[in-house]
Amino acid sequence: MHYSKLKDFPQNFLWGASTSAYQVEGAIDEDGKSPSIIDMYEHPSDVADFSVASDHYHRYKEDIALFAEMGLKAYRFSIAWTRILPNGTGKVNEKGIEFYNNVIDECSKYNIEPVVTMYHFDLPYCLEEKGGWLNRDTIEAFVEYAKVLFIHYGSKVKYWLTINEQNTMILHPGAIGLPKGGKLPSKKDLYQQNHHMMLAQAKVMKLFHNMVPEGKIGPALNLTAMYPATCNPNDAIAAHNWEVLRCWNFVDVCAFGKYHPLAWSYLKDRNIAPEIQDGDFETLKGANPDFIAMNYYSTATIAASKGDASDVAARAGDQQIMLGEQGVYRPSENPYVEKTQYGWVVDSVGFRYTLRKVYERYQLPILITENGIGANDTLEPDGCIHDQYRIDFIQKHLHQMRLAITDGVKMLGYCPWAAIDVVSTHQGYKKRYGFIYVDRDEFNLKELKRYKKDSFYWYKQVIEENGKNI
């Protein structure tokens, strides 16, 4: 749809950027922090691990001052469960409480709205040894952890995210790392874990609304629209299959308190449906998220299944993520979109399409919590980083977001990935996302000096203008 005039971004729009604890903080064994599953996973030997990362733990004041200089109105970061409750439950680590209090207070000092992710892939390893999310005890452990956060930070933090990319953890478990020994859970076990996460999330949202009545809370999922490869009706059915299984079922359980009927039929047919205990379906009802947080990177194009093993293939550029499932869907190429050097589809129009679908389905405000392009940035001798490709990527996505706002989609804010360079899970510091360059490579920490990229100055101007020239 074309418009004679585009709507402006809201005056209170949360222009921000994002990080996660394990990718930015470092200090993995300092001040009482215990190991998380991320710390204990088998890590590629040729890329940086998370032990130092970008050393945000020791440099948060410097970093947040830079975020303020860039003009950020919001900073989305995650809290490491292992810093707060090193044993998963029980005794609270006061050093951990103090650190995040300091981060939040530093944000407030610059009028930056903290947006807190409670769980970003990094389950305490001590809980994993007891079965992790497959163990129903982890549900109550998460509720206990959440209560500690709400007690200490509920009066300071308005916007909360429960679980980051639950759908990625369930559908592509190898994407966040391999357990020691390299064996991934079965599909049935993964969907049992998913059910327990859903229960934990519902309980925490209800607790939040009781303890922090003025706050806002939502799930943070990786959402994307699916295109059928052709106008063949079977391709359209396959695209809908994957859209439901990858996206809508995860949001439906949170927003509507029940499984999507197509997803439940799929789970039952394949004998991978979770075991349901008395009261589970009642627990899922009434979570009442206040908004949907959405991570968006690319779209997918889907063809009808051929019903054999050829339906499954590795996603281009990422061997950790398999696409396609026998009898459900198969991936297809889209000749109308570009790809990054890592094989990720670049589709800004698909961003608008996805926003329209999400808002139409759930009628809740949307907060973008990740969106960005990973690239091999180069630090020039004069200290400049010319990342025009990042400016182009974000500019196009912001324009499509403005079109979506004009379409009637209610947007809370935009927190792209990432505020500062972080450790990419599989490519280390070869693949960078930040507006701020961290001068280190895979194994040479150098001085970890910060440099402002060209995109830093560009985004600063966008924020100053409230996106009026996008």
Where are these regions (language model features)?
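Active-site region of glycoside hydrolase catalytic domains
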Residues: H2-P44, N87-G88, I97-I470
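Active-site-adjacent substrate/metal-binding segments within catalytic domains
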Residues: E25-Y100
